[in-house]
């Protein structure tokens, strides 16, 4: 590769254009002087649509018509992309890989797939196998092929990488690790101007899904309902939102508020006013292998974080120094962790300070972008 020619990347597929992993990867590369041309066609309408398709909706003629039109648009746009050095398929992109492999092969260019998460595991964890076991097994076959065709796979944790190696026979030399990170242009330390200092505010935000175990937070709020100084806010939507709200209503909790999704600026301000960020507490395979965006965002904001313990958490962060870990699927353990942090201001300050230091040393927007650029340059040489 000429030292005078900037790397040119084609970011390709029916990926979720607004999903943080895709959006941040594109912006990180551009910040590191990589030219990124997006070749995207929308296929998915949202979370419920993806679940409906995975549960057997892919058999309906309407979906096939939608898919055919999406891939025709994608091919048309690809024909106008021009020269590129590496083709990257964004998340989720399992169905896109065979086409991407053909197109990149015709141009003799390397293919990279940012795997992010297993849609097969997602389908299993959301119970889709009960309604359509054939569809879920088909998803597994498609995903296995999608992981074997590219020249390089990008995965966020070593635990998830081992899962792909064990389940799909992927060679370790074909995998590179790239943490999720956060958009620290927005998620950064900031003051709260509307905080009631008499209230200890515990904030959860994210998708209400099984592997996050939002019900554990509700149960912890129930255990702490007699303490007027502790309040909970849960922000977001998702398949488990109604079930979680019903559980909270059954307890008549006055210390817990559900809030719909908001724009990111308002979300950041809400987080700035929280005394502690609550992570995930489920025990599904994905919950144990991943580190969610909200964890990195909390570190970037210098906020104390409570999360369920797991191999990936213990191998990356240090309990009592950069994060506070408790037993998963255990409301009493979460309630005790909240009380510990509420009563120990020095511990909260240490978690905030050391967590932020860890983020600055390992996970900044620019550092992750440099690492991704390095992977692509090594592949292009």
Regions found by a protein language model. Give the residues of each.
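Nucleotide-sugar-dependent
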Residues: 212, 265-270, 275-299, 306-315
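Acceptor-binding helix/loop patch of EC 2.4 sugar-transfer enzymes
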Residues: 45-59, 82, 112-144, 183-185
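Nucleotide-activated donor-binding/catalytic signature segment of Leloir-type glycosyltransferases, i.e.
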Residues: 242-269
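Membrane-proximal helix-turn-helix segments that form the acceptor-binding/catalytic region
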Residues: 72-79, 102-106, 113, 133-153
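A short, well-ordered alpha-helix in the C-terminal region of glycosyltransferases
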Residues: 333, 340, 347-361
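Conserved acidic donor-binding segment of nucleotide-sugar-dependent glycosyltransferases
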Residues: 319-320, 324-331, 340-345
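Carbohydrate-associated surface elements
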Residues: 159, 181
């Amino acid at each position: 590769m000429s030292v005078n020619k900037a790397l040119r990347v084609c970011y390709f597929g029916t990926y979720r254009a607004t999903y943080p992993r895709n959006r941040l990867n594109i912006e990180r590369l551009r910040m590191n002087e990589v030219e990124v041309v997006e070749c995207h066609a929308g296929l998915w309408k949202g979370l419920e649509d993806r679940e409906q398709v995975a549960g057997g909706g892919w058999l309906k003629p309407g979906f096939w018509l939608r898919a055919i039109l999406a891939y025709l648009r994608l091919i048309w746009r690809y024909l106008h992309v021009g020269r590129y050095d590496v083709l990257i398929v964004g998340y989720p992109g399992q169905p896109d890989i065979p086409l991407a492999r053909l197109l990149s092969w015709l141009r003799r260019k390397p293919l990279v797939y940012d795997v992010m998460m297993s849609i097969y595991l997602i389908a299993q964890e959301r119970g889709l196998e009960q309604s359509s076991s054939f569809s879920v097994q088909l998803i597994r076959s498609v995903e296995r092929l999608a992981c074997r065709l590219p020249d390089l796979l990008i995965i966020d944790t070593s635990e998830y990488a081992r899962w792909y190696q064990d389940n799909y026979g992927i060679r370790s030399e074909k995998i590179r690790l790239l943490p999720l990170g956060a958009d620290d242009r927005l998620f950064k330390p900031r003051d709260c101007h509307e905080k009631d200092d008499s209230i200890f505010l515990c904030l959860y935000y994210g998708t209400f899904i099984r592997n996050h175990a939002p019900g554990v937070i509700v149960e912890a709020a129930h255990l702490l309902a007699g303490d007027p100084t502790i309040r909970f806010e849960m922000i977001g939507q998702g398949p488990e939102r109604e079930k979680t709200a019903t559980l909270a209503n059954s307890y008549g909790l006055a210390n817990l508020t559900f809030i719909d999704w908001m724009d990111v600026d308002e979300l950041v301000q809400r987080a700035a006013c929280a005394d502690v960020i609550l992570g995930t507490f489920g025990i599904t395979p994905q919950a144990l292998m991943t580190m969610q965006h909200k964890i990195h965002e909390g570190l970037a904001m210098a906020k104390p974080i409570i999360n369920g313990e797991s191999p990936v958490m213990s191998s990356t962060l240090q309990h009592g120094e950069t994060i506070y870990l408790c037993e998963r699927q255990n409301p009493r353990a979460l309630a005790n962790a909240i009380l510990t942090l509420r009563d120990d201001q020095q511990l909260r300050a240490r978690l905030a300070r050391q967590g932020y230091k860890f983020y600055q040393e390992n996970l900044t927007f620019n550092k992750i972008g440099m690492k991704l650029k390095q992977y692509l340059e090594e592949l292009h040489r």
